Amino acid sequence: MIKKVGIFQDLKSAFACLFSWQDIDEHYVIKLFGAKICKKHKYNVDLKPLTELGVTQEKRSPHLIVSLTTFPARINLVHKTITTLLQQTLKPDMVILWLAEEQFPNRELPASLTDLQQFGLSIKWCEDIKSYKKLIPTLREFPDDIIVTTDDDTYYDSRLLERLYNSYLERPDCIQARQAFMVKRDFNGEFFMKARSYVYNSSYLPSYKNEPVGCGGVLYPPHSLDLNVLNAKQFMQELPTHDD
């Protein structure tokens, strides 16, 4: 299929590569001469206290596991994110928080965090592989289960897991993501990443050009990733800070 493109479209594409502004899932994203600035909206959230177990006691196969990590600078705040993950309309089988032993040598944690264990939180320890801790240790320990990764500084909607899981049931062969970057070519033919928001709509076609964005929540079906992703030496050498 061939589509004619006039000079106006060429100029429009060129301008878009230099400057653009988007409002994506509670973030302002501004692109200016190749530089990207991303700023979260500020708003008040009414965080309700937990009153019941936040994980299911019913048998589910494969298991649905929520996995995240944090570091010392956020250890006193991460309980807020976890609280929202324990208040889901679809309860997971596990909610795991991975912490690096090197960062917490005495394993001293705030009560605001450890108190969540009575509501279903599991705290596990691993080596320091930075933000990859949210996925890799869980993938190693539970290779046959569904894994949903989240960030540690976001309040999640109570239907996050329900929507991701329902989307997974429709396409169990695909990784599900609320947000993704889509690889495209600019007017010079170079590859670049374009922010795109997902709204749990099955009409969005799967593509290997989509890169999931972790803060929105990402669901990985069992065996959806190549075993090479477990090679910590390789990813820490080539992409030490880009777990997405």
Residues covered by each model-derived region:
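A short, glycine-/small-residue-rich helix N-cap motif at loop->alpha-helix starts
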Residues: N76, C126-K134
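Boundary detector for helix-to-coil junctions that initiate low-complexity/charged tails
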Residues: M1-D46
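Short, acidic, metal-binding catalytic loop of nucleotide-sugar glycosyltransferases
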Residues: T81-M94, E101, D115
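Active-site nucleotide-sugar/metal-binding loop of Leloir-type enzymes
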Residues: L135-I146
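Acidic donor-binding loop at a coil-to-helix junction in glycosyltransferase catalytic cores
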Residues: Q237-D244
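Conserved catalytic core of nucleotide-sugar-dependent glycosyltransferases
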Residues: D157-Q234
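Short beta-strand-to-loop acidic/aromatic patch adjacent to the donor-nucleotide binding site
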Residues: D144-Y155
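N-proximal low-complexity "stem/linker" segments adjacent to membrane-targeting elements
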Residues: K31-Q87
